[in-house]
């Protein structure tokens, strides 16, 4: 049996987190405190310190806010200058930043709560500008979708997916979340979506961030939503919901072009349609022969999918391929659920949980900024690596803080010399 020696030195297994903490402080602390305001003048924690503490939970492999107190505090507090707050302080800060929900009534008289969390949404955009992930004056591609979050909180409502929860509308540019507005889980996806999108677009435009192309699913295919989206972007690409008036036109079409997209054979065509009176748009039609050979009562031997757009120049294939890229955004929701705490909401009410959703979205955006700056190949990582891989390959390294010649030095016990460069460059 091997001999064991117990050493009482203050070693930490999370040596990689300290350079990330310093980078967070350098890039975002001023932006966070200027946007949210100072939380205290003398004693206590600023919002930037609270958000940094929450970031450490997920970048050290934690799964809930309480992990910062129960598991991580003794390690994070080893940093000689940067303070880490407790889980209770984070939870109090969430309550302080909570924005009152707005209640809307539908035509049928039913009430639905929305939470816009304007200040936190502004911070989300400002943080992306501070890290350089978005630049003022440039145009970007924009995606919008609703994510159904399963939870049994006090005010959770039954969704059409047969579970209790919320259904926040989430706006994405590239791989970054740029806006979140939470809603009751039983809210129809089109209900007040125009107002939600308009607030998000105006928030981006106030920071001189403009939208070139917008992609959305059939939940956004209504006249008022399309009119508003068209006013804020160059081109839109929206999945058209099927209706009987389209079928007559589609069945009469000739000149279908056979193409192969991602190894699957489709036939493409496009026509001009007047879906709403006096408003003609291009309808790109994609059809695929049914594999089972069964005939559908409406569509016959094919399955039809349509994209409504105001792009009259791009080829049908280019439009279909561009729209299909929207499916990759589902990875973001999977990442948020499993890596950044969306599957473990901390509070009992929607308004407070909306603040948490936005906090963790900011942390994920920052994580993506780190992956862009980091020489990932030196640590066996990729720019698209999940947070779990990042924890194993970068964060989990033994380290010890020592003081020598009146300076604090971090000793990292690793044969990977790449760690030495983190504090020598603008990364650490």
What does each of the following model-derived ranges do?
Residues 53-54, 68, 86-90, 140-148, ...:
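Short, conserved catalytic/metal-binding motifs centered on acidic residues
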Residues 189-247:
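Domain-level cores of phosphate- or acyl-group-handling catalytic modules
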Residues 343-374, 378-406:
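Basic, amphipathic alpha-helical segments enriched in Lys/Arg and hydrophobic/aromatic residues
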